[in-house]
Regions:
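Short, structured helix-loop boundary elements
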Residues: 63, 151, 251-254
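Short, flexible loop segments at the rims of nucleotide/cofactor-binding pockets, characterized by
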Residues: 91-97, 143, 160-165, 202-204, ...
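Catalytic core of membrane glycerolipid acyltransferases/transacylases, capturing the structured
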Residues: 111-168, 194-196, 206
């Protein structure tokens, strides 16, 4: 019964993403505004995170970020649908985008050098990844969905352009890819629990931060780059950058990476996925997200 209902919803989803892009954006903003008016836990998480991360902003400035973030969240259904259901040709024809720094990635790929490509959780991360994968050979890491049926939809959608997807809990797959000269997308900016993490500052607050990246880089001998994404009006911008983080220890490396992600978020704070409980393991999910 659940799968039957889900199949109907997926069919409806595939239909609405056939709408012209301008109409999608209009309906997305309408959905976002309705979400903004509603009382739900994701709105609460977003509001709490923005308050924690921008203590120096006045309440009106934080409110604007929060409101715009929730309204933009309404577009996720369309951006993700485009990423999972559209063809490469249709995306190239209908979605304005620009990739800066692609040559940095292509340089390593031509040399058959593995690349751990860090990125942050933007609201449009599925579309970001799809567009990059249209233009370069990319592999990904994911958290499996609880629904087996939806997991198949998610995986098939991501594999439209990506060459492979690995479960984030099974590092052996993407470690092998990196050793074999592949490029793997990797987002370290969520709370995956304290057991596999270190407490490292994020916006000046202790946050459970995955400690694996430097170990993976050292073990595989791969290089690393950073992908930052944001909108300039209707054009999606993807910047491929080559930062340098301290290799002295996993903690110092991740502190540098967290600060780098912070700086990118501050440029377009309304486009970040604030709906995740980033500080649940360190500040207490029952205490601050209740």
């Amino acid at each position: 019964m659940k799968n039957a209902l889900l199949q109907i919803l997926i069919f409806f989803w595939k239909v609405i993403v056939l709408l012209p892009r301008k109409i999608q954006l209009f309906f997305g903003d309408c959905i976002g505004y309705l979400l903004f008016l509603s009382k739900n836990k994701r709105n609460r998480f977003s509001k709490v995170n923005i308050k924690l991360c921008f203590p120096n902003l006045d309440s009106n400035s934080r409110y604007r970020i929060y409101k715009n973030n929730i309204i933009l969240f309404g577009r996720v259904i369309f951006d993700t649908g485009i990423a999972w259901f559209w063809s490469d040709n249709r995306i190239n024809k209908n979605i304005p985008y620009k990739i800066n720094g692609l040559h940095l990635l292509q340089r390593y790929q031509k040399l058959n050098k593995g690349v751990l490509l860090f990125f942050k959780h933007s609201l449009h991360l599925e579309l970001d990844s799809r567009i990059l994968a249209i233009n370069a050979e990319i592999y990904g890491v994911e958290r499996k969905h609880n629904s087996t049926y939806f997991e198949s939809i998610q995986k098939n959608g991501r594999l439209k352009s990506m060459k492979g997807i690995a479960d984030r809990n099974r590092t052996i797959s993407f470690v092998r890819w990196l050793k074999n000269g592949k490029t793997v997308l990797y987002a370290p900016d969520q709370d995956y629990g304290i057991k596999k993490s270190d407490q490292i500052d994020f916006f000046g607050l202790p946050a459970a931060t995955i400690s694996a990246p430097l170990k993976i880089i050292t073990k595989t001998g791969c290089n690393y780059l950073f992908m930052n994404t944001y909108y300039e009006e209707s054009c999606l911008i993807i910047d491929i950058e080559e930062p340098k983080f301290s290799p002295a220890s996993s903690t110092m490396f991740m502190q540098d990476l967290n600060k780098y992600i912070e700086d990118k978020i501050k440029l377009n704070p309304e486009e970040y996925l604030w709906q995740h409980r980033r500080f649940k393991s360190t500040l207490g999910k029952e205490k601050i997200y209740k």
